[in-house]
Amino acid sequence: MAVVSLEDLLNAGVHFGHQTRRWNPKMSQYIYTARNGVHIIDLVQTAQLMEDAYQYVRNNADKGKRFLFVGTKRQAAGIIAQEASRCGANYVNQRWLGGMLTNWETIKTRVERLKELEAMEESGQIARRPKKEASVLRRELGKLQKYLGGIKTMRRPPDVVVIVDQRREYNAIQECQKLGIPMISLLDTNCDPDYADIPIPANDDAIRSIKLILGKLADAIYEGRHGQLDSDDDYEEFDESLAEGDYDDYDEEEDEDSETVSSQEGEEE
């Protein structure tokens, strides 16, 4: 059975790329055609590359490899947190801090500080401090939770990194390249496939597209670690607290390409 069907990819809008004037010519091999000024991604290739990515992820998960999901744009943040949490991966969904991987020993001290503050809060130590001091500590705790909460259980740099929006997460990509960490990347038509070890040509702006692709990768991790998924294991309700509301606040019409994409979706229906 296929990992994902062409119908599922089509229904999720995975095929809609960016406006033709914003393309990266290196993506031409993954583009099927252009329609109304928007590039259309070849879903036959996407489906096959999803098969390859799924097997790669499942095999690595079976070997005990560790995964990091990275996606800080609003429409990806909540999905990143949800799917990474579901399969036991770490994630960064707010802002990539410079040196998060290449300067891990320093970042790790901040993670330890986060754990320390959480323990203090849970035990009531912060509440017993003077009001001003408690406020400062809680503010520090909140900031650390926001930026480092998704890597709190990460003991060393990951073995595989999943990237949503290659252009936005360029700093993360540079660090992965420097450390030789393989990357699975969703590649929209404005991306550069040279920076992806495992490419998945796909719309990286639409929530449904991101959800479908990341959901399948999370399934592969879960299956590699725990065995075949049961039907009840596939998905769980989205927890809004994981992304601080960014997931639901996204308005597709704010994106320059989305009005064209929306009109084309309407035509197909």
UniProtKB/Swiss-Prot annotation:
One of its GO terms (cellular component) is cytosolic small ribosomal subunit. Residues 230-269 have a biased composition (Acidic residues). GO terms for molecular function: structural constituent of ribosome. PROSITE patterns: RIBOSOMAL_S2_1, RIBOSOMAL_S2_2. GO terms for biological process: translation. InterPro entries: Ribosomal_uS2 (IPR001865), Ribosomal_uS2_bac/mit/plastid (IPR005706), Ribosomal_uS2_CS (IPR018130), Ribosomal_uS2_flav_dom_sf (IPR023591). The keyword Transmembrane helix does not apply. Residues 228-269 are annotated as: Disordered. Keywords: Ribonucleoprotein, Ribosomal protein. Pfam families: Ribosomal_S2. Belongs to the universal ribosomal protein uS2 family. HAMAP family: Ribosomal_uS2_B. This is Small ribosomal subunit protein uS2. It comes from Crocosphaera subtropica (strain ATCC 51142 / BH68) (Cyanothece sp. (strain ATCC 51142)).
